[in-house]
Amino acid sequence: MEKLSDISSCIILSGTGGLGKSMMMRHLFLDATKRHTNTGIIPFFIQLKNYRANFADLIDFIIFEISSLFSGISRERMIAILESGKGLFLFDGLDEISQETAVSFQSALDAFINLYTNNQFIISSRPYGNFSAFTRFTVVNLESFSKAQSLELIDKLDFRSDMPEIKSKFRKELDLRLYWSHHGFSDNPLLLTIMLMTFEEFAEVPSKMHIFYQEAYTVLSKKHDANKGG
């Protein structure tokens, strides 16, 4: 998170393949939550596929989206967070907004940031033809690792030195099949690490991506809860 905030307070994470970007955004959310005691930053994970132009403004949409996690949060409380400059807003899936509402969202987001400039804003998206409309955002392209680079990362990773067989078995699976069967995760440094954590927890990486995605998020949540409890 620190590396991203060093680049800009307004960032677009651009890359192909939907699962990897959403998982990365969830990781940023959980990581910021874990660090809240030290930083004071309050993260909000917002799925843009649910955006509609009939919301009064972006604050109303955000409150609607986060109501399941932040039950009963008021508009006044949200404005107080925004005015403090302690908000991290993770907007997931810009490319999932319908063409009919895209202009409305761009306008609402621009007004939102103009009012509350001191917060942090991260948007994830597939490569999108209209990034040029987001003039204040810095586009960060998610670069893919080659198979050799992914294997090298696993070799260098300090992971469970008490049980080296976990990493060794995962590396073998990565070399034989996982790099290609789970492309989009296996070629991304952060997501590859999450794959290894999932392998440690479940002793395998499921071939069906929706099951793997659920298990990976379960592992992230457990790690977050363990750190929170400690």
Predicted feature descriptions by range:
Residues 1-229:
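P-loop NTPase signaling cores
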